[in-house]
Amino acid sequence: MSFLQSSTRTHHRWLTRQISSYHPHQPSSSRSIFGLGWPLGKKKPPTGEAMAGRKNAPSPPTRLLESDNLFHPLTSSPIAAMREKAARIRAIARCPVYPDQLVGYDCPECGYPTHSSREAWESDGEKAKYWPRLREANEDEHDLRSQRPMLEFDLPDCQPYEETITLANWDLLLYTRGFRSIDEDRSRRHVSKLLTYPMTIGAILHEFSPYSTRNQRLTLEGYRSLTALRQSLHPPLGTNTAQVLGRTINPIRIFILGARAESSLPPAVWSQLPYLFPSPDVSFQVYFIGPEVILPQQQITGPEGPTESQDVYKRGRPNMSFGVPAFSVPVSPTLTLHMIQGAYREVHGALGPFDPYTDVYFAFSPGFGFPTVPIVPGPGGGAAEKRESQALLDCQSIQLQTNWNQDVKLILEEKCALFGAGFSPADVQRDVDALESVEEIKDQFDWLLNPGENVFASQKWEVAEFDPRVAVKSNYAIWGIRGKRMNHMALAHSH
């Protein structure tokens, strides 16, 4: 597991508790102008039972840190989780000045352990390049754990059909979706981190997508593929949708490959995806597929018991139809989540048949271009396993040649779109180079979405514990491909 996915998963567990414990005074079905909100319905006086319930309601937690007191050295932080983070960094991170020594000195500018000593910190001429983002990350993490009311996590409900959503950027999306007014950059970073996965998917698929042929992000093949999907996502209102499209409407199936942190997001966050498509004829089935997917029964529950966002899993059930550990939960009439703990190639047959009008794939930071890391055989591992692992190391293969090879070939054969995301320009370039160089893959696809920045990338820095100088942003850039379709004209000429 990469540092990005590890820190992201921890962050999402924390957000799950924050979302479920937040009880806003203003309902999410309210609208606001200039920060002043009012309920859409007439306010009724509280009944006696309601008043009694208020008296018995748990008091809000005591705020640990004020907004002007968020910067603390991690080692001496008043938050236990931050002190634990500092301990992990000190245990594995190397000093950039003296690489033979572990970090042990907290940078006074950012609060992270970055060097082995003050003398090493003072002699480092590169520290000004990275400490500003580390300080921002420091304050963001303390703010999340300050136990202040997280008003930005009051997520809106269904979008009225007649209200248009704007997907040009985070600010316009939050405004047109009816989020509470967010005036601070820090709150915007928190929300972007929470919503980057469903909004990245929605922005690509939506008819008002910020990616088009006009700005040269979408190719002509991409336009054709997304037009097919959008016919299912945006059926005409007030018409017989099945008659218009000439077929029965099936759920939109979204397959998230190699899922890790994505599967641990609260279901309420994934509900924001169908809210972008308010037609009553549209529903979504989201499949989280990967050996590191977290099943609900494996989620860690705090001492206070399951949270409200975890209670939704009580509606679900284990799903034995995939041949691997799996769990399905109906979140709402328009959204069902499936957690499948296994490689895609193991369940490909069970998921078919596929339809480019309703099926689409996403892979967030798949690491196609990263070197293959073989599984270390356990104590009972045989000699054959050890030889295979050593062979992988010796040939210096990349993940698209080994772990992902069969999966990607199967997807390309189905002619359904595959969109990927990376956490940095270098990460995306590695994936692109891998796709364009691996035999039996490089000539088998067309580009749908040219690689480039993601409008709905997370704006929050994720800091690597193995080297605090390394910080990235989830889903920084995106790309898209699809298996080549047979060129009938070329085939006719060949005969």
Feature roles, as predicted:
Residues 1-59, 82-83:
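N-terminal mitochondrial targeting presequence
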Residues 45-82, 121, 130-149, 160, ...:
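Non-catalytic regulatory/accessory regions that flank a structured catalytic core
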Residues 69, 84, 248, 280, ...:
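Mature, well-folded catalytic/scaffold domains that follow N-terminal targeting or propeptide regions
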Residues 80, 87-92, 99, 126-360, ...:
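Positively charged, amphipathic N-terminal segments that serve as targeting/anchoring signals
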Residues 91, 103, 111-112:
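Short metal-coordination and nucleic-acid-contact micro-motifs, chiefly zinc-binding Cys/His arrays
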Residues 92-98, 107, 116:
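Short cysteine-rich clusters marking metal-coordination/redox-active sites
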Residues 109-130:
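Cys/His-coordinated zinc-finger cores
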Residues 300-495:
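Domain-level detector for long C-terminal conserved domains
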